[in-house]
Every structure is written in structure tokens, then in C-alpha cells.
Amino acid sequence: MRFDIEGFITFDTEEASLVNLLTGDCIELSATSTRLLTNLLQYRGDIISRVDIFQSVFEKYGARPSNSNLNQYISTLRRSLADLGIEKNVIITVPRIGFKISEEVIITSDNDYSSSFTLPVLTADLPQRSLLW
């Protein structure tokens, strides 16, 4: 799956990378960072609790979650996005609850492209002939 962030950063979940489309700069992400960012982007606008993140990003893959680990991964993602030129705070901390993607950030995904793009209907318009008799 691919997400575009602010129109110039692409996050490719298969490649586990963030790419600035304007400069070509690329940052490789760890598997855990990729799962975390994917989770946040898929539920953008919603607050994802720490407990849900622990389960879906860490425990499900055999890793032991902790608040310290999670905070470190969030910090790394924020730094990576800033290094690629995003000036907005993309990942918002909701104190004592969890995290969410800022509603001010423009995010599009593969699903958004496929559902919003439709091919135009083509009609066979034959040239009109006027007969002058």
C-alpha cells in the first residue's frame, strides 16, 4: 500500500520507506516503524490507544511492548518526516490515551486513488454531414 503525505512524501509499506518526491531523499524504516506508521495512517483522524498499538504493532509480531519503546518509535517517525521536509506535526500525542494523525495533514492512499478516479465515458461521435441539395 502507498500513502502520500502532504503531496510530496510517499510512504510505501512494501518498501518500508519514506521518499521525498521533490528531492529524491529516501529514509528506510524498520519493520516496527513501518507497522506503526501504517496503523496510524489507516486510521487517520482516529485516536489509537497505546494498548491497541501494543497489540497490533508489537505483540502480534512477538515483540515486547513498552511505553518507552513506543515513544522512541514515534520520535523516530516524527524526526524522519521532519528530515524529509514536513513542517507540520503529523503524529499527535493524545496524553494518557495514545496517538493520532493530525487532521491538518493531507493524506491520500491507494484506496483513495482507486475510488476517486473514474474513466471518462467514450461515445462514438460520428462526424455530422450536412447534405445540400
Question: Predicted segments — roles?
Answer:
Residues 10-12, 87-120:
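A short linear beta-strand->loop->alpha-helix hinge motif most characteristic
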Residues 1-30:
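Short boundary/linker motifs that mark transitions into or out of structured domains
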Residues 26-57, 77:
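Short amphipathic alpha-helical recognition elements used for nucleic-acid or partner binding
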Residues 29-37, 63-82, 97:
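DNA-recognition element of transcription regulators
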Residues 9-11, 48, 65:
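A broad, structural micro-motif
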Residues 113-133:
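Intrinsically disordered, low-complexity regulatory regions of nuclear DNA-binding proteins
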